[in-house]
């Protein structure tokens, strides 16, 4: 299905070039600091826990002046029960293979009541759709029908907000908000759960035709378990990586909670695919935000690591990964606290505040529960209102495309990370960044396979021979003569 873009600003017919995007995506250093608040996976804040959602909203209102809060972004799974399809008046007009929870209407009403607190105080709320927010959410293949989402939340998108519409002119749960903060214009772009290829195409057009920073939000993008054949042993707890596989023939094993398990109608695009096709393809993508993943499995706070349901792509730590050894390195954050606490306490009411400082060129995060602070007796003893560990309180520098520090990187441009390849296959890589480079080296499973001197890229026609069948770690590293250090890029490939 082809998608049409309803835009409230004039879209140029010509795409920006990468250099033009980079040049015009700047955030003015004279702009004031401001904050965006994330509400991750609020799905369990219903029935007797509905006060938690309201506590979050009331806290945001109380802190709006001090933190200069400009928006609240829901990361999806606003409710837990989906619901039967409804008409514009909320009357049930369809059935589901699997009946939704009997409280589904109450859940929507309670969520909207909490959101109304924000609206009544002039705080913008952007409701990204999650898998639990679709009609008949438990059916497989999962429907794309979102009548309840639009009935209860569809009037939140006040101008200048625009939806991506389908070829029949119907709006889809994919939309963007243009916000001017200081002298800079930002786009907050919310995309559906595992976006369909045509939605990704429409999003690419939007980003390409927008000259400012873009914050991409989608419910399922990052995972924090290093979901790949070898990553679990080499990635630190709390490190994020794109969820499952999104490009053809990828070798990465998916979590059970994946695109393959939901089989959404119309297909979809998950983590690796979103990185290659959208998030990593534009210099003006400033941040990518997601929820959905709650690993390890749920349990009470003292018994579950602090990184449950959280993670981030920190290129100062994991510079060798595909997400860091690329020309563009947007800030990427996973936030999902629903797995912390036994049933009745899931989530503990944690929200996340991102403070953007244009003058310092940093984004600082902290994680806080207004409910624990206000009602400690409602929660198990020892649960902190502020999460002060490094997984939940951290600072990013701006990406270099927005004036942050630039550095030398090595980028393997072919084959893609996770590809199936023949025993002997061509490889290409390039050095990117501000520094002079010396030689390049290729390694397979830790064994050096070649040296190339005084080059900024591997010579055309360079091939790698693998030692046998199976999964192999292929690395290309470049010597940064200015910093006097090696920088590398790593991919995993498999051969028959």
Predicted regions and their residues:
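Active-site neighborhood of phospho(di)ester-bond hydrolases with catalytic His/Asp-centered motifs
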Residues: 38-40, 70-77, 125-130, 191, ...
